[in-house]
Amino acid sequence: MKGTLLLLALLMIGELGFHTTEACVPFFAGYAGVISGSRLWLYHELSAFNGTPKETVAYEKIQDCYKEQGVKSQTLEPQILASILVTPECLQYYSEETFTKIKDALKKISQH
């Protein structure tokens, strides 16, 4: 189900007219907030998108699913996301400093 959600999110980004490379960092920041298990982190990441209260509740429910799945789910997801992040398109668009920040954030998540 999570893989389907990820695919759906990536397709939606493309359909809304964004360049996928421009959406890499915001997508991963939001996704990291979801799988972190921290409501505070989730709210911080979602605040950048000015979402509606219903959207926030939906993300909270997704976060609850990750909490229910346990540590295995939370540690595998950052590894998968990190491998997606280093696609040639994303590497061309963002600086090395940006990638370092994202990788550090993903490492923090996988350590919890």
Curated annotation (Swiss-Prot):
Its main location: secreted. One of its GO terms (cellular component) is extracellular space. Pfam families: Feld-I_B. InterPro entries: CH2-like, Secretoglobin, Secretoglobin_Domain_sf, Secretoglobin_sf. Expressed in lacrimal gland, at higher level in males than females. PROSITE patterns: SCGB. Residues 1-23 form the signal peptide. It is found in: Secreted. Keywords: Allergen, Secreted, Signal. Belongs to the secretoglobin family. This is Secretoglobin family 2B member 24. It comes from Mus musculus (Mouse). The lineage of its organism: Eukaryota, Metazoa, Chordata, Craniata, Vertebrata. The gene is Scgb2b24.
